[in-house]
């Protein structure tokens, strides 16, 4: 085997892509800070049980596992940063009231989520802890859309769902709850034949409700259909009211209701949302409410948040990260060194051409040059 080969669905990030990713990362983190979010940096490696406190079997299967040579315990390479941030809020910060946290870092998956998906993603996201009201859901939803607009994406569609609908159906039908994982997979994949097979022997009301969910997709008027087709349970009524409220607050994106879009259902407890753009089959960002995630760390708090993969966003973003630069010669000249240093201190990119290498790669847009005129170093257009 060639020593330069990488594992399947793992790739290096080359300069032009890395520069674009870093430009987007800085934009998003600066925007999160403008909303009052504090940065945290959880470790890439943790004890396995700490990483798998939520997320169900799907997260367990996606997590790389290895043995710690120090303690002998099983470790995991994180596949999702959300449980880690919940641990920080619950166990380390232990604050009262509202806490806003954000993060950015790599996550690793044992299997790719799609045909061309990378198994190493650069996850960036934001979370609010400590407020159970829809105001927190609305802020996170707006921050996610704001972040996507900052990346230059257009014609964003926001799909809304609610974990409370399925939870209410399972709570009143034990047989349905027992096959919950299989039902979730059938609904998420909109596999109607499999869904029909799984619901054949359930109670008539539960069967009809579960089979209706894949059809409850469209604009906000779908909520009226849902009220008519789903059981008149208080939990379902509240869930539909929540979705109606959140949908009405969105002013800068198309809104769709999809009551079968149950990505991450295993740890969500309320409103869920995913963002889509034209030409990309999978969601470019997703999030929702997960009030019980911190329970495993001794302190369950209301929580909602979102995340996205910066590598995927950089691939589809029209943002141009090739900034202007200044080309300077390489000389043993104190005045030149001082001029270059002053320009860099002022935020300029200055590239000094090494002897015999006067050309500059297209990676840099050197639209100006630092030249010597009458004993002084000045900037001129190129």
UniProtKB/Swiss-Prot annotation:
Q: Does the keyword Magnesium apply?
A: no
Highest taxon, organism lineage? Bacteria
Q: One GO molecular-function annotation for this sequence?
A: histidine-tRNA ligase activity
A GO biological-process term: L-histidine biosynthetic process
User: Annotated pathway, please?
Assistant: Amino-acid biosynthesis; L-histidine biosynthesis; L-histidine from 5-phospho-alpha-D-ribose 1-diphosphate: step 1/9
A GO CC annotation recorded here is: cytoplasm
Q: Which Gene3D superfamilies is this protein grouped with?
A: Bira Bifunctional Protein, Domain 2
Where is the protein found, in the record's own terms? Cytoplasm
| Main location class | cytoplasm
Q: What else is known?
A: This function is generally fulfilled by the C-terminal part of HisG, which is missing in some bacteria such as this one.
Subunit-level organization: Heteromultimer composed of HisG and HisZ subunits.
Its biological purpose:
Required for the first step of histidine biosynthesis. May allow the feedback regulation of ATP phosphoribosyltransferase activity by histidine.
What family name appears in the similarity comment?
Answer: Belongs to the class-II aminoacyl-tRNA synthetase family. HisZ subfamily.
Protein name according to UniProt: ATP phosphoribosyltransferase regulatory subunit
**Gene name, Swiss-Prot/TrEMBL:** hisZ
